[in-house]
């Protein structure tokens, strides 16, 4: 082939190459087995991370719900002492409402002062508890539960839950009095500590009452004491009268008997022949 023809062909092929740009064909690279395994591990770790995050969120919500439920239950649950205090407060309010019509002005002031003092003490106890209170002066709340089985302390009876110990009307108070008096006074004369018991019992019963009411009770006790003294004096006088009559009759009988053992008596001369 002539040299010129070769040059023409080269020039034409060069021009054609310049006119048509080369298209890059992407050939997918084949992955190796270890690369595919790494990719699957990464996906599994992502899924596990998402699952653990969901589990943590669920556990957190469950813990919050449980804590909230426990807090509500604790707030709603009342202790035995709280129930007793509420019971006493309701009974006290009922008593005050019943006695409000009969009380005098001084009694009303005394009741209001006592109620305010008790409220202040309760508020201070809620704020400070037992801080600053010596152990010897700590006042223990009286328990109204009574054990019915000495061998089992858990078997108790709550007296404040019984209707008879929660009187509100005059009739209910009379029923409680009639139920308590036979129990307290049964065989009282044979109990050596009964007098001390009654002194302290009456004092504690009247401790929260107004002074005017205590004076009325004291007057009735004084009248009862005077009546008992009269009865005791009358009984003692009857015994003395019986003893005196018995002694007089014995002396009179002895005076009419001649004493044959006495030789000091002198007889008149007229007694002889």
UniProtKB/Swiss-Prot annotation:
Function: Component of the eukaryotic translation initiation factor 3 (eIF-3) complex, which is involved in protein synthesis of a specialized repertoire of mRNAs and, together with other initiation factors, stimulates binding of mRNA and methionyl-tRNAi to the 40S ribosome. The eIF-3 complex specifically targets and initiates translation of a subset of mRNAs involved in cell proliferation.
Any single Gene Ontology cellular-component annotation: eukaryotic 43S preinitiation complex
Ranges in coiled-coil conformation: 50-97
Segments of this protein annotated with the region Disordered: 1-158
GO biological process: one example: formation of cytoplasmic translation initiation complex
Biased composition (Acidic residues): 34-54, 95-104
UniProt subunit comment: Component of the eukaryotic translation initiation factor 3 (eIF-3) complex.
Domain of life: Eukaryota
Cellular localization per UniProt: Cytoplasm
UniProt feature, compositional bias: Basic and acidic residues: 55-75, 105-126
Natural source organism: Pyricularia oryzae (strain 70-15 / ATCC MYA-4617 / FGSC 8958)
Gene Ontology molecular function terms on file: translation initiation factor activity
Cytoplasm as UniProt keyword: yes
Family to which the UniProt record says this protein belongs: Belongs to the eIF-3 subunit J family.
Protein name: Eukaryotic translation initiation factor 3 subunit J
Main location, first listed in the record: cytoplasm
Listed InterPro entries: eIF3-like_dom_sf, eIF3j
Keywords: Coiled coil, Cytoplasm, Initiation factor, Protein biosynthesis
